[in-house]
Amino acid sequence: ECDNENMIENLYKAVDARDLPCMADVESSMLYFCSKVVKYNKVTLTGECADEIFGGYPWFHKEECFKAEIFPWSMDMQPRKMLLNDDIIQKVDLESYARTAYQKTINETPKLYGEDQIEARRRQISYLNLRWFMVTLMDRMDRTSMHCGLEARVPFADHRIVEYLYNVPWELKCLNGVVKGLLRAAGEGILPDEVLYRRKSPYPKTYDPNYEKILSKELLKVMAKKGAP
């Protein structure tokens, strides 16, 4: 069972695996999951990149995210700044850096002649995902799986399917108004409907307030060590 204690215990291992600060409970739970899978199989297939290329994320659908002139998965920088002191915040200026990186990516997004404004925006969101969000998730999957000795293969990241789907019209990707409808339709007759048409379930993270309490205690322990980074 992946409980709060397991996620805290594996958080240290997840940071080692990433060699950087990681995505906290989401990453430690994945590391724990990989450690269980590798006991039965040394190679596995994962679903990374399906949401990026088939348009499964909320920012493809929610108007607030869709129209935001910033990375849609980082619309609020405040939680990311809470652990930084004021001097660092002033020197780094996270909002300015993010806006610059966002605009640079938007400017280099390939355009398709004849697209209306909404379709052009969907193309921009797709490109933002491919350039930034997908890279983060791929790196996470690679590092957490290999840390456990598990080889994770990502068929949806095959450049041929990525290139093909980049130009598939939205009404096909969202076939019959269903999120990732094209992907679901492709699986008909192969997978049962209860699997094909179930609601998206984000990778396990916890909303248990006890996790936050345990994590806070661990952070205080680190901060109490003068030699801690």
Task: Give the predicted meaning of each segment.
Residues 44-46, 128, 134, 163, ...:
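Short hydrophobic-aromatic micro-motifs
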Residues 130-143, 165:
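Short Ser/Thr-interspersed hydrophobic loop/turn segments at strand-loop and sheet-helix junctions
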Residues 71-72, 133, 202:
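Generic structural signal for residues positioned in beta-strands
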Residues 1-110, 114, 118-125, 143-190, ...:
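ATP-dependent adenylate-handling active sites, centered on carboxylate activation for C-N bond formation
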Residues 191-229:
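PAPS-dependent sulfotransferase catalytic core
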Residues 133-138, 151, 228-229:
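A short, ordered amphipathic alpha-helix with a cationic face
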